[in-house]
Structure formats: structure tokens, C-alpha cells
From Swiss-Prot:
Localisation: Cell inner membrane
Organism: Rickettsia prowazekii (strain Madrid E)
Protein name from the UniProt record: Phosphatidylglycerol--prolipoprotein diacylglyceryl transferase
Described purpose of this protein according to its UniProt entry: Catalyzes the transfer of the diacylglyceryl group from phosphatidylglycerol to the sulfhydryl group of the N-terminal cysteine of a prolipoprotein, the first step in the formation of mature lipoproteins.
Gene name linked to the record: lgt
Pathway the protein acts in: Protein modification; lipoprotein biosynthesis (diacylglyceryl transfer)
Topology within the bilayer: Multi-pass membrane protein
Keyword Transmembrane belongs to the record: yes
């Protein structure tokens, strides 16, 4: 049967989620994605600041990195625990600490970053939207790498399909499925990065507080809502109101907020 399927669809090999281990110390694909994403985002943010001289300085970004790391990990994990699988983690709280096994929520990480950015701006007396405009410009880098890690780990895969895009994931039911992780990596990562880079370098959008943040929220939400149509819903949640997924519901407010930010943005 596998040979027949292999002739029709690509069968993804079962890749170890741990890249290597040295004693008790292990590096997972997830960890690598987060570390590389943060470093590349940090580097790109400093280059943007050097070129466009916005209100946010390089020192601000350097100081904010610690806030961002904590916000992404804590917010992403708690978001997943509370929104996607609360029963599992409340009955066995120690599982919450096992971030290396996966289970991070983008929407939770977003809330974490927003809270961290607000506290940081209050402390250093800088404009909140000026900081989020820089953050959202570099965020697609991390999104791209995170979705690639999801694909390697054979998780968050798509719905069953007979199309030529179908991939058989080794830890699934051997049904060909959409590689929705790659769809998200392409649109939420690569395409969104290109859109924001074009906006910054061609239209100097950093001069308008909140504009880049609004562009990011709108396009991310649209991409996520559409791609959720190809992604298998979380088994413990399933569909909501017969056809909606949790990802679509959580993306709707982001779409509205993005529209508001674009409408209110003005040169400063």
C-alpha cells in the first residue's frame, strides 16, 4: 500500500524533532527556528533603523530583545494552553513546561509581544506604535522559520486532499494531506515579508505611526483565515459553528484592528 501511495504522493520521512543532544542538553528544530528567527529579526531591525532613522533607536531594539524572547515563549505557550488544549494541561501542569514538544500559539505570542512592548514603552517613554511598526516588519522572518519547523516535525498538517500537493505525513493516518505548514511559511512568512519590506523601502511607511502594524495585521489575518481552510483543525477543538476554526476566529479581531490602524495612521 505504501508503495502505491508513494507513486502518487510524496511521503515525508520521519525526522527526529531533536537535531542533536549532548548529555542532558538538546537542540530541537523548534529551538533552532526561534533562535535563528530572533537573531535575524534583530539584525534586520537594526539595519532598518540605520537606514530610515525612525523614532526607535538601535539601543531600544537591543534592550527590547530580552522582553521579546520572554514574551514569545511565555505568551505563545500560555496561548496554546488556554486556547487550544486547556484540559490536557490543567490535569497535568508539568506538561506546560515541555515547549520542546511543540504547542505554541501565534496569537498567544502576539498578545505577549503587545504586552511586553507596552511595558517597555512605558518604561523608556517611547511611542508604542513606533515600536510595533519595527516589530511587525521583522516578524515574518520568525513566522517563516516556525512553520518550517512545524513541517519538519510533521505537525499542524492540512486536510485530506487528492491534489498533486498532497503529502503523506508519517505520524498521520497515511492519507495525503495539504502541507499547510508550507502554505503558511510561504504566505505568512515570505510574501508578508516582501509586502512589508516593499512598504518600508518604497513608501517609507515608518513615518506614519501604526501603518506598518496595520498592514501586517491585515495581511497576516487574511492569509491565516484562507489557509485555515486547508489546515486540519486541532483534534481537541474541531470546527466551531460547523465550519470555522479557532485560528480563523482569533484572526478576525486582528483584521479589524489592522484596518483601524491604517485608517488612523498619519505622518509624524
Amino acid at each position: 500500500m505504501l508503495n502505491e501511495l508513494n507513486n502518487l504522493f510524496m511521503i515525508l520521512p520521519n525526522i527526529n524533532p531533536i537535531i542533536f543532544s549532548i548529555g542532558p542538553f538538546s537542540i530541537s528544530w523548534y529551538s533552532l527556528a526561534y533562535v535563528v528567527g530572533i537573531l535575524l529579526g534583530w539584525f534586520y531591525a537594526t539595519k532598518i533603523i540605520e537606514k530610515f532613522k525612525p523614532e526607535i533607536t538601535k539601543k531600544h531594539i537591543d534592550d527590547f530583545i530580552t522582553y521579546a524572547i520572554i514574551a514569545i515563549i511565555v505568551g505563545g505557550r500560555l496561548g496554546y494552553v488556554l486556547l487550544y488544549n486547556p484540559l490536557k494541561y490543567f490535569t497535568n501542569p508539568i506538561e506546560i513546561l515541555k515547549t520542546y514538544e511543540g504547542g505554541m500559539s501565534f496569537h498567544g505570542a502576539t498578545i505577549g509581544i503587545i504586552m511586553a512592548a507596552y511595558l517597555f514603552c512605558q518604561k523608556y517613554k517611547i511611542n508604542f506604535l513606533s515600536l510595533t511598526d519595527i516589530i511587525t516588519t521583522v516578524a515574518p522572518i520568525g513566522l517563516f522559520l516556525g512553520r518550517i519547523a512545524n513541517f519538519i516535525n510533521c505537525e499542524l498538517y492540512g486536510r485530506i486532499t487528492n491534489s498533486s500537493f498532497g503529502i503523506i505525513f508519517p505520524n498521520s493516518d497515511l492519507q495525503p494531506r495539504h502541507p499547510s505548514q508550507l502554505y503558511e511559511a510561504f504566505f505568512e512568512g515570505l510574501i508578508l515579508f516582501c509586502i512589508l519590506t516593499y512598504a518600508v523601502f518604497r513608501h517609507d511607511t515608518l513615518k506614519k505611526r501604526g501603518l506598518n502594524s496595520g498592514i501586517y495585521l491585515i495581511f497576516y489575518s487574511l492569509f491565516r483565515i484562507i489557509i485555515e481552510m486547508f489546515r486540519e483543525p486541532d483534534i481537541q477543538i474541531g470546527f466551531i459553528l460547523d465550519s470555522l476554526t479557532m485560528g480563523q476566529i482569533l484572526s478576525a479581531p486582528m483584521l479589524l484592528l489592522g484596518s483601524y490602524l491604517i485608517c488612523r495612521s498619519n505622518p509624524k
